[in-house]
């Protein structure tokens, strides 16, 4: 289960990096690579709005996924600690000498 969320987390991270780099900044960013200032049917404002909304959505998904991963990891660690304690108790009980 954690593997699935980890894969989703990595995918969201990569998409978030791409979307952030595509946004126009003071120096133009990666969006200026195409060389076309004339966007044709899609205006620069529309692309900017789409990238802004995409960034917000991906950031929200990233944070939610990070919280879920943290909770799953904490639960898995607590289960592991309880199993270790149980094994230690069983070994301690088995190693005690029996008085006759």
From Swiss-Prot:
* Highest taxon listed in the record's lineage: Bacteria
Q: What is this protein called?
A: Protein-export membrane protein SecG
Q: Where in the cell is it found?
A: Cell membrane
Role summary? Involved in protein export. Participates in an early event of protein translocation.
Segments passing through the bilayer: 1-21, 54-74
By its UniProt entry, which InterPro entries does this protein fall under?
Answer: SecG
Which GO terms of the molecular function aspect are on file?
protein-transporting ATPase activity
Family membership noted in the UniProt record = Belongs to the SecG family.
Q: Which GO terms describe its cellular component?
A: plasma membrane
**Keyword field contains Transmembrane helix:** yes
Look up and give the membrane topology term. Multi-pass membrane protein
The biological process GO terms on file are: intracellular protein transmembrane transport; protein secretion; protein transport by the Sec complex
The record's keywords, sorted A to Z, are: Cell membrane, Membrane, Protein transport, Translocation, Transmembrane, Transmembrane helix, Transport
């Amino acid at each position: 289960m954690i593997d699935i969320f980890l894969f989703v987390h990595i995918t969201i991270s990569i998409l978030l990096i791409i979307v952030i780099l595509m946004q126009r900044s003071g120096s133009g960013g990666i969006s200026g690579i195409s060389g076309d200032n004339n966007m044709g049917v899609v205006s620069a404002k529309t692309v900017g709005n789409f990238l802004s909304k995409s960034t917000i959505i991906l950031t929200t998904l990233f944070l939610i996924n990070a919280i879920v991963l943290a909770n799953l990891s904490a639960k898995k660690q607590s289960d592991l600690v309880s199993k270790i304690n149980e094994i230690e108790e069983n070994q301690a009980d088995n190693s005690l000498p029996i008085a006759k």
